[in-house]
Amino acid sequence: MLHSLLVNVGLIVGLVVAAVVLILVIAVVAWWIKTRNAFVRLKNKVEEAWATIDVYLKKRYDLIPNLVETVKGFAKHESETLKQVVAARNIAMNANTVADKAAAENGLTSSLRTFFNAVSENYPQIQANANFLDLQGQLKSLEGELESSRRYYNGQVKTFNTKLELFPACIVGKRMGEGYEKRKYFELDSAEERQNVKVSF
């Protein structure tokens, strides 16, 4: 009888241990899946935020040739400044990584600032041109949208990068492969470049 009781107790203990192990395994697997899915959602948010920036940058790039053509008629002596703007635009359009894109955008913003300063000082009559005023308004609006999109993107990158660094989520993040490494912020270099391009005259 005692032997039978010990066997039953041993069997019960074995079943309890097996159940606890099974519950732990299920909990770990569920946590792993939940954490992996969180990384996928965060990665998608970062990519969506970058796509939004890309749309506004493309609009900005498309606007610049129209702006240059409009100003050419008024500012014949600003050909070097116009060439710098177009060259900076082309560099920015061909940049691939976030870091390269940020550096190129810094250059383009600086060229646009120089361009607008030169035009506003030397050609005040351009203020009467309806096409120029329309392009100026569009550029100003795009600059605001870009700034807002840049803040949103950087916020998503911060959330993603933080999740990659926190324990124990970092264990899952390190095993997720390509696309799941720390992301770069889309930052402007200096306080002067952080200000929007001044497009008012």
Whereabouts are the PLM-identified features?
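A helix-centric hydrophobic-segment signal that preferentially recognizes long
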Residues: 2-201
